[in-house]
């Protein structure tokens, strides 16, 4: 049942904070109503106290269920029974072996020798299972985020690959144009040289120094023209 806010030192045994809409089990432990509902949200029963595993709340939904004291007495009687492998009642199987996870009755635990197997209450294992489930959900979310980032990286790589291919095609086209221009200018230069050579044969009295200076000037103008054209094409 719901209780008013208790003293300052009364905290919820699950969230370790002051209880909100506090409820109290008959064993004395206090909890937030939301914490208890969330703790047993996926369980059909039994409903022991989340802190001490007392079955006071289970008796509220099962009035015919024997109290914890009588169940402990049944465990003691089972422990004193001589037959270890005999059929055990459901009330006696309240422990789980840490080694293999099978139910462990008190008779088996007492007959295990000087070093009995480690055991834990079932409700502790249920709580650990809920914690593991939360960890799995976090790992699944991180995995989905990593997949999204991987997809974004692949998309960006595809875009940059397209840009690189476009620049490569443009550079190849400019190179072909420049090469064709050089071939054309080379043919034009050879034709001019042949004309100058024919003119020099007709004019044997011309000064060789003048003809050399004229040829050198033509070569300089051609080199300057080629250089300017190459720079203009590279800067496009």
UniProtKB/Swiss-Prot annotation:
Keyword field: Cytoplasm, Isopeptide bond, Metal-binding, Methylation, Nucleus, Phosphoprotein, Transferase, Ubl conjugation, Ubl conjugation pathway, Zinc, Zinc-finger
One GO cellular component, as annotated: cytoplasm
Pfam families recorded: zf-C3HC4_4
Superkingdom as given in the UniProt entry: Eukaryota
Catalysed reactions, as listed in the record: S-ubiquitinyl-[E2 ubiquitin-conjugating enzyme]-L-cysteine + [acceptor protein]-L-lysine = [E2 ubiquitin-conjugating enzyme]-L-cysteine + N(6)-ubiquitinyl-[acceptor protein]-L-lysine
GO BP field: positive regulation of cell population proliferation; positive regulation of DNA-templated transcription; proteasome-mediated ubiquitin-dependent protein catabolic process; protein autoubiquitination; protein K48-linked ubiquitination
CDD domains: RING-HC_TRIM39_C-IV
SUPFAM superfamilies: RING/U-box (SSF57850)
Protein name: E3 ubiquitin-protein ligase RNF187
Species: Mus musculus
């Amino acid at each position: 049942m719901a209780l008013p806010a208790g003293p300052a030192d009364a905290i919820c045994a699950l969230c370790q904070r002051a209880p909100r809409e506090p409820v109290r089990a008959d064993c004395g432990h206090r909890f937030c109503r939301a914490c208890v509902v969330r703790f047993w949200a996926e369980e059909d029963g039994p409903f022991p106290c989340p802190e001490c595993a007392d079955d006071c709340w289970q008796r509220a939904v099962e009035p015919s269920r024997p109290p914890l004291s009588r169940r402990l007495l049944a465990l003691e009687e089972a422990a004193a029974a001589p037959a270890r492998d005999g059929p055990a009642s459901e009330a006696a199987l309240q422990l789980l072996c840490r080694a293999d996870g099978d139910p462990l009755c008190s008779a088996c635990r007492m007959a295990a020798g000087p070093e009995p197997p480690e055991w834990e209450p079932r409700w502790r294992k249920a709580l650990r299972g809920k914690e593991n489930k939360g960890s799995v959900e976090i790992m699944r979310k991180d995995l989905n985020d990593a997949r999204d980032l991987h997809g974004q990286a692949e998309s960006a790589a595809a875009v940059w690959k397209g840009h690189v291919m476009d620049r490569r095609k443009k550079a190849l086209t400019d190179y072909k144009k420049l090469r064709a221009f050089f071939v054309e200018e080379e043919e034009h230069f050879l034709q001019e040289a042949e004309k100058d050579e024919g003119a020099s044969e007709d004019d044997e009295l011309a000064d060789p120094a003048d003809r050399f200076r004229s040829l050198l000037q033509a070569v300089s103008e051609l080199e300057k023209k080629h250089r300017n054209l190459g720079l203009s094409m590279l800067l496009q």
